[in-house]
């Protein structure tokens, strides 16, 4: 009897153990995965962004833009592929996040009380202010009270942060009125202000500065807000795994200086604005560039052809017969020795000049020290194109002596004007140089380049708006291994 009881006891223990293991297994399987685990298991980071000249656009070497570069770096940290969903208006961004169709919204959007109620912000990565925009030559309101006295209403993007700002202001200014426009974006409203279709709108300071490169008639009436933080947005849940990694990611970028480099790359040149020069450039862009565009594309090689075009405009204003008292000539304003070194026989021949200028710049870029970040090498090369490689290296050495970073264009460009001052150049290997001119030279080219990008983006968006409805989104898969994906990457349109 005791043997039977002992046997039954063992059987009972086995049954109970099996049940416990089964139940434990069920609990493990039923425990929900964190957002971070889901992304890693999926192997894809899904990011929604705006198709504009700051967040994301297709350049000559594939996708680019501040938010794109950041999203790609974050996907690499996660060791997953990046799936970009670009939208043309704000209206589709947050609904897609609510439906869990994307993991992150990365679209240079400000943190507002309204957004905080529904969504979780990531770390702040720069600041913008909201500005009232009007067209030069029209009446300029100086304050909110002036806006309440207008016959013409302010027009803003529906459900934007600007609408939230105006709703608050209306509590103090009951007569403040405005119109809202759905299925559009800020850049489209800015264009309408420039063409006179509407009188006033609100825009953030960075977007306005970039758009002024295409529409120089736009001007700031006054600022409505102080600086506001810009961040990515996530779903509002108790799961903070994705946000925690984002905090770590942006912290590393700031500490390493990489975030500052990206900001310099995309809007380090926007502070200075020359109305007359920009208007002249836009006219030349429309009337002259189409004739020379094929040659810039033909000889650009690894360069973005628009960059080469911007350099040529700075040199000659796209005049193939340009000459200067110093002896430089042609579209790329080559000296005789430089022309001979790159095989140019006739500097006034536009094709030879463009080919020679591109080759000369290519050689300079190769000489720039490898300690300098790849995307910043071009600015050092341009400074060399203007004042000579030796003077550029002098500026780097001087920057280091003064406690700056000789590999940072931001630091070096600030010290270029010192090459004019005897107390500095007397100790430099190559002596005096017009460093201030080189500084302006590089920044001008960056602005012209931005204008061409913005102009092309505007034309492309016109076509896209005709082809796609507002709800249509393009999903673009960016392979982890492709730092510069080609334009011909696979694009799948979701209906």
Swiss-Prot record:
Signal sequence interval, chain numbering: 1-30
GO molecular function, one term: peptidoglycan lytic transglycosylase activity
Any Gene Ontology CC annotation: cell outer membrane
Catalytic residues (UniProt): 315
Subcellular location: Cell outer membrane
Main localization category: membrane
Swiss-Prot/TrEMBL keywords: Cell outer membrane, Cell wall biogenesis/degradation, Lyase, Membrane, Signal
Class of the enzyme per the UniProt entry, highest EC level: lyase
InterPro entries listed in its UniProt record: Lysozyme-like_dom_sf, MltF, Solute-binding_3/MltF_N, Transglyc_AS, Transglycosylase_SLT_dom_1
Enzymatic reactions: Exolytic cleavage of the (1->4)-beta-glycosidic linkage between N-acetylmuramic acid (MurNAc) and N-acetylglucosamine (GlcNAc) residues in peptidoglycan, from either the reducing or the non-reducing ends of the peptidoglycan chains, with concomitant formation of a 1,6-anhydrobond in the MurNAc residue
Record GO biological process: cell wall macromolecule catabolic process; cell wall organization; peptidoglycan catabolic process
Topology class, membrane: Peripheral membrane protein
Domain notes: The N-terminal domain does not have lytic activity and probably modulates enzymatic activity. The C-terminal domain is the catalytic active domain.
Protein's job: Murein-degrading enzyme that degrades murein glycan strands and insoluble, high-molecular weight murein sacculi, with the concomitant formation of a 1,6-anhydromuramoyl product. Lytic transglycosylases (LTs) play an integral role in the metabolism of the peptidoglycan (PG) sacculus. Their lytic action creates space within the PG sacculus to allow for its expansion as well as for the insertion of various structures such as secretion systems and flagella.
Family classification: In the N-terminal section; belongs to the bacterial solute-binding protein 3 family.
Name by which UniProt lists this protein: Membrane-bound lytic murein transglycosylase F
Native source organism of the sequence: Aliivibrio fischeri (strain ATCC 700601 / ES114) (Vibrio fischeri)
């Amino acid at each position: 009897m005791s043997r039977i009881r002992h046997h039954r006891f063992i059987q009972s223990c086995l049954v109970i153990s099996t049940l416990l293991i089964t139940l434990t297994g069920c609990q493990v399987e039923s425990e929900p995965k964190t957002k971070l685990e889901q992304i890693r298991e999926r192997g894809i980071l899904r990011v929604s962004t705006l198709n504009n000249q700051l967040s994301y656009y297709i350049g000559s070497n594939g996708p680019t833009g501040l938010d794109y570069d950041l999203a790609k770096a974050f996907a690499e940290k996660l060791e997953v592929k990046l799936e970009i969903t670009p939208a043309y208006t704000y209206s589709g961004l947050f609904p897609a996040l609510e439906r869990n169709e994307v993991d992150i919204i990365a679209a240079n959007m400000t943190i507002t009380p309204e957004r905080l109620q529904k969504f979780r912000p990531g770390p702040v990565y720069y600041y913008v202010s909201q500005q009232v925009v009007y067209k030069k030559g029209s009446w300029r309101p100086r304050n909110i009270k002036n806006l309440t006295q207008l016959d013409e209403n302010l027009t803003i993007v529906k459900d934007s942060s600007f609408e939230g700002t105006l709703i608050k202001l209306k509590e103090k200014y009951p007569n403040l009125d405005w119109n809202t426009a759905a299925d559009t974006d800020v850049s489209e409203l800015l264009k309408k202000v420039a063409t006179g279709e509407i009188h006033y709108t609100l825009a953030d300071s960075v977007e306005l500065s970039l758009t002024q490169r295409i529409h120089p008639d736009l001007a700031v009436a006054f600022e409505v807000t102080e600086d506001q933080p810009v961040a990515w947005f996530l779903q509002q849940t108790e799961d903070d795994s994705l946000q925690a990694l984002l905090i770590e990611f942006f912290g590393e970028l700031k500490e390493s200086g990489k975030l500052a480099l990206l900001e310099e790359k995309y809007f380090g040149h926007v502070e200075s604005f020359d109305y007359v020069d920009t208007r002249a450039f836009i006219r030349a862009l429309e009337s002259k560039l189409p004739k020379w565009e094929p040659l810039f594309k033909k000889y650009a090689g690894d360069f973005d052809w628009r960059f080469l075009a911007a350099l040529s405009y700075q040199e000659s204003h796209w005049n193939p017969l340009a000459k200067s008292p110093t002896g430089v000539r042609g579209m790329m304003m080559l000296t005789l020795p430089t022309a001979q070194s790159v095989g140019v026989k006739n500097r006034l021949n536009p094709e030879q000049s463009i080919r020679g200028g591109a080759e000369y710049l290519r050689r300079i870029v190769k000489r720039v020290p490898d300690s300098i970040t790849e995307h910043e090498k071009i600015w050092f090369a341009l400074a060399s194109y203007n004042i000579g490689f030796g003077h550029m290296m002098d500026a780097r050495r001087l920057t280091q002596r003064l406690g700056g970073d000789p590999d940072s264009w931001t630091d070096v460009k600030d010290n270029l004007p010192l090459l004019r001052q005897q107390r500095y150049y007397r100790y430099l290997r190559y002596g005096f140089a017009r460093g201030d001119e080189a500084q302006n030279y590089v920044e001008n080219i960056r602005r012209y380049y931005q204008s061409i990008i913005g102009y092309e983006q505007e034309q492309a968006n016109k076509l896209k708006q005709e082809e796609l409805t507002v709800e249509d989104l393009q999903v673009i898969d960016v392979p982890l291994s492709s730092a510069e994906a080609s334009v011909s990457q696979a694009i799948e349109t979701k209906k």
